[in-house]
Amino acid sequence: MADADEGFGLAHTPLEPDAKDLPCDSKPESALGAPSKSPSSPQAAFTQQGMEGIKVFLHERELWLKFHEVGTEMIITKAGRRMFPSYKVKVTGLNPKTKYILLMDIVPADDHRYKFADNKWSVTGKAEPAMPGRLYVHPDSPATGAHWMRQLVSFQKLKLTNNHLDPFGHIILNSMHKYQPRLHIVKADENNGFGSKNTAFCTHVFPETAFIAVTSYQNHKITQLKIENNPFAKGFRGSDDMELHRMSRMQSKEYPVVPRSTVRQKVASNHSPFSSESRALSTSSNLGSQYQCENGVSGPSQDLLPPPNPYPLPQEHSQIYHCTKRKEEECSTTDHPYKKPYMETSPSEEDSFYRSSYPQQQGLGASYRTESAQRQACMYASSAPPSEPVPSLEDISCNTWPSMPSYSSCTVTTVQPMDRLPYQHFSAHFTSGPLVPRLAGMANHGSPQLGEGMFQHQTSVAHQPVVRQCGPQTGLQSPGTLQPPEFLYSHGVPRTLSPHQYHSVHGVGMVPEWSDNS
């Protein structure tokens, strides 16, 4: 490579005024973009042989002139930074079949060090010793003249660095120094290389491409020009532009940007991040809910529920709350001073549902949430007369304080028969094939007292979607307390109980406990 430097005359000294007298067309383009011939140098005898007709045109010369009028600055970093504007040229006059090598170097424009003060550049001292010059060879080299003339020749991958120990081949520069890029066109030898003293080459210099290397932009006009013309200069844009860009991207999705000071929109809105999860649990309303009370309130929510689970699954929460008590506590927002209204509008019919704010429910799948709502359903038998009229569905709507955690062990769901059967004797329920229930050890478990009557909540009935033991002082039944499968009633076991030994509770589907005394 040392021979190449000697052959090209790529001295590392500052670029002198007579340095423009290069072997071939090296003068800058005229107003029409055509370079003019320069006086011949002593090497013109052999260096210009076959190179005299080559012409080079700088691409985007008008943009380079805009920067040059202000004072072009190029950022240098330790990792390396690309130039903007990019160095691109159009080459003509090459032999289509001859192979050429195109390369660049960047040499000091003078021996001064600069500083930017009072909104202008001024000389502040002598330049630091120049680093050993590096050549950047175009990746397509060597290539035929037809290849180079077919399209623009771009050096946009060239990077500038201030790391004197750079191992990546980037051009090493000093900050606050002025530099001049140069383009060299070399005719490849028989080995598709260059470096010998007899290598034919020519050099082209465009003064408008000179720049001062900086680690950060000094002139705000240069910064503005970079922003206006470089689509990748996002890091220099103002905070207002970045905020508007961020908000526009956020609003294009389903997650709206809602300021903290404003009242949040309805959860049932289509733009709510919870709308997709809620619709999985919805019935006929916009949002729906699996939390509805069965105290005479009919709803179509059971249509989307899966088949009942014959055995209750273990639950961590064993507290059973009375449905009427929960409705009174949830709907009396005035009794709790720390509850804040969620929406200022009055509840409507489409908002007549409970909102669940239990944090562990949000990360579950839709099917698991539905099953968990079944397992946690609180059976309300209406055994005791209510002390006050039952509130309507609008009265028990709890839209006003969804921030309060819900009682996960006392969720309420509408229970209606999935497929009502005609009245028949007790034995018919057990002798029919598809209606054999799985009653686990009914004789070994005493039923809890509910009011004055004795009722037993069975684990499963053919027309009962939700099964749960619900007594004032009993917990949830776990699978460990159930009997083995051999104790289940089967087709061959005769049942001789008569209809007068049991009665039904309307709308609930509960079977009473029977004994010899009844």
From Swiss-Prot:
Changing residue 327 to R: Does not affect transcription factor activity. SMART domains: TBOX (SM00425). Acetylation at Lys-339 by KAT2A and KAT2B promotes nuclear retention. The keyword Nucleus applies. InterPro entries: p53-like_TF_DNA-bd_sf, T-box_DNA-bd, T-box_sf, TF_T-box, TF_T-box_CS. The modification N6-acetyllysine is found at residue 339. Keywords: Acetylation, Atrial fibrillation, Cardiomyopathy, Cytoplasm, Developmental protein, Disease variant, DNA-binding, Nucleus, Transcription, Transcription regulation. One of its GO terms (biological process) is pericardium development. Pfam families: T-box. GO terms for cellular component: chromatin; cytoplasm; nucleoplasm; nucleus; protein-containing complex; protein-DNA complex; transcription regulator complex. It comes from the Eukaryota. Residues 15-28 have a biased composition (Basic and acidic residues). It is found in: Nucleus; Cytoplasm. Residues 262-301 have a biased composition (Polar residues). Residues 58-238 bind DNA. Residues 34-45 have a biased composition (Low complexity). DNA-binding protein that regulates the transcription of several genes and is involved in heart development and limb pattern formation. Binds to the core DNA motif of NPPA promoter. Monomer. Homodimer (via the T-box); binds DNA as homodimer. Interacts (via the T-box) with NKX2-5 (via the homeobox); this complex binds DNA. Interacts with GATA4. Interacts with KAT2A and KAT2B. The T-Box domain binds to double-stranded DNA. This is T-box transcription factor TBX5. It comes from Homo sapiens (Human).
